[in-house]
């Protein structure tokens, strides 16, 4: 059972996955309230699914680009759960996660996230016959 955490942007989210796929997903607008909102939502999602935290087998967490404070909150919760439950934690680049939602696209995908101060982070992705992959470096664009 995998817990996924994304607190990189103001649109935060969590999800629980098992061998059968997505069990529960919740996304919410978090206006700099990640610290207060994240753990109660994880607890509620587990309770709604009848899942004890001790049954988690791994945690994935967004690692940026994104809000420094938001990333710290997500990484701290992920690392804390991993240490207490003795489970692995894996970091997932935020742009990769955003683009992955479009992995079936036959056209190239450009994932873009605001980086603050008039800057944007971007990367290009494409699907070929066998795989989906990033086909550019992560780029910081100044406007």
Question: Can you describe what each PLM-predicted range is?
Answer:
Residues 1-63:
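N-terminal beta-alpha supersecondary unit
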Residues 15-17, 73, 124-125:
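Short amphipathic alpha-helical segments
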Residues 29-37, 68, 72, 76, ...:
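Residues at secondary-structure transition points
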Residues 60-89:
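DPxDG-like acidic metal-binding loop motif
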């Amino acid at each position: 059972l995998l817990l996924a955490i994304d607190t990189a942007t103001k649109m935060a989210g969590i999800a629980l996955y098992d061998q059968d796929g997505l069990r529960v997903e919740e996304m919410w607008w978090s206006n700099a309230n990640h610290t207060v909102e994240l753990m109660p939502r994880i607890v509620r999602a587990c309770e709604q699914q009848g899942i004890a935290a001790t049954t988690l087998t791994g945690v994935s967490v967004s690692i940026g680009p994104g809000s420094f404070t938001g990333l710290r909150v997500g990484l701290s919760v992920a690392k804390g759960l991993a240490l207490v439950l003795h489970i692995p934690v894996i970091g997932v680049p935020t742009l990769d996660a955003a683009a992955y939602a479009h992995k079936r696209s036959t056209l190239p995908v450009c994932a873009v996230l605001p980086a603050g101060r008039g800057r944007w982070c971007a990367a290009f992705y494409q699907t070929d016959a066998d795989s989906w992959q990033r086909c550019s470096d992560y780029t910081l664009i100044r406007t």
